Amino acid sequence: MIIDTHVHLFPDKIKEDRTLFFDGEPEFKLLYDSPRSPIAGADDLIATMDEQGVDISVVSGFPWRNPDLARQNNDIVIEAVLKYPGRIRGLACFDVSWAGAAKEAERCIDAGLSGVGELAFYLSGIDRTALESLVPVMEVLRNRGNLPCMIHTNEPLGHAYPGKTPVTLEQINELARTFPENRIILAHWGGGIFFYHIMKKQLKTDLKNIWYDTAASVFLYDSAVYDMADRAGVLDKVLFGTDYPLLKPDRYYADLDRSGLTREQKEMVLGKNAAVFYGN
């Protein structure tokens, strides 16, 4: 079984003319200003899943500043889950600084979504204000069966690119320490914080409820990142994610084949870990 845990879907009107939605949405413009940045709908996704051998995709929208846009995008995700039962699962997405974020999380969970994500703090990093804004949403997730929250992270070093935030490893660690009971997925390998699982003190405890997805891995890391996750003892917490439509799964399949993982370990990453995590 192959489960892609990191996929983005948008309403058709945004796919047709994204430029109409740049005003007042600096984060969206930052990531999608280039016409080469692909935008997809549910039918596009299913066609790609069938082509690439993906059984299930976990999809989300975008953390729009405009609450109406956030609701509309979440409605598209809900519709996709209902249209393709067993193939698509969904996460609610919004700007957590919005006063109605927790209620929107509840609405989406009631409608059948499986958690929250990909939440992002593209311009600020995960600072104290960001942590405080997460509190009501994290409480909702705990109260609803400890559903997961996926949060955008990135490596604090290296080349710049659209969507690279000023987040630090200290901030990522503080996120884990602030919400020790929540199940949190750190997108994009958690900015590399999983390497610190090899430390003898503190980090293993701090990161006990943290998972890591592989989204954009082929742009960021050598295939040895999978071997390092294995050596760090966190391979069972690695979730396959493509960031589709940014990348298709076959790029990741090839990357995994270049790693030193066994067939059984590759199967863990590609789907078994996510099946356990999401209860498939």
List PLM regions with ranges.
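Short beta-strand segments
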Residues: 4, 58-61, 93, 185-188, ...
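Generic structural signal for well-ordered alpha-helices
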Residues: 42-46, 74-81, 105-106, 134-138, ...
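Mid-to-C-terminal alpha-helical segments outside catalytic/metal-binding sites
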Residues: 1-8, 12-56, 106, 234-239, ...
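Active-site environment of divalent metal-dependent phosphoester hydrolases
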Residues: 10-13, 64-67, 96-100, 123-125, ...
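Conserved, mostly hydrophobic/aromatic
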Residues: 6, 49, 77, 108, ...
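Catalytic pocket-lining loop regions of alpha/beta-barrel enzymes
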Residues: 114-115, 120, 127-239
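Short aromatic-enriched loop/helix-cap "lid" or pocket-rim segments at secondary-structure transitions
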Residues: 14-19, 71, 103-104, 161-164, ...
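Active-site gating/metal-coordination segments in enzymes
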Residues: 55-56, 64-157, 161
